Curated annotation (Swiss-Prot):
Residues 49-81 form the LisH domain. Involved in the biogenesis of cilia. Required for the recruitment of PLK1 to centrosomes and S phase progression. It holds the Pfam family FOP_dimer. Residues 151-160 have a biased composition (Polar residues). This is Centrosomal protein 20. Keywords: Cell projection, Cilium biogenesis/degradation, Cytoplasm, Cytoskeleton.
Amino acid sequence: MATVGDLKAVVKDTLEKRGVMGQLKARVRAEVFEALDDRSEPKPVLSPENLLINELIREYLAFNKYSYTSSVLTAETGLSEVPLDRSFLTKELNVVEDLNSQSVPILYGIVAHFLKEHEDGPCQKVEKVSTENHTFRNIPRGRNTKDTHSGPVQLTQTSTEDWHQRRHR
């Protein structure tokens, strides 16, 4: 007859194989955060840039079914429970989409666009700066990022398959 320890190990292994263990841990973290969140303390007003960034992240999280992470983001940032409309985001970001790019988060399309741009032509030399655990890139002095991308960002031929192909080159 199996011991309690054996039964626990089998249940744990089964939950991990089904992907449920990660969901349970995320759910517990989200619930703990919700319980500790002081709703009486007003959240700081988000700048328009932070609002757009948070909405792009929320759309990405929803697409990947990271619902508990999304709920923590919403609670921490004070985002409205109702996301901003995608057409509003694309208009604000000066993004032009095609049918393929509409099936994935805007963030995927933006990253794919800049990766393709990098592949298509020479980039200015970017100096890498290392810290203990991270590497950052410094934009060369005198380079104005507004001069680099003055027109709309054209998001085309972006799909999850395309994204994964680019990632594994």
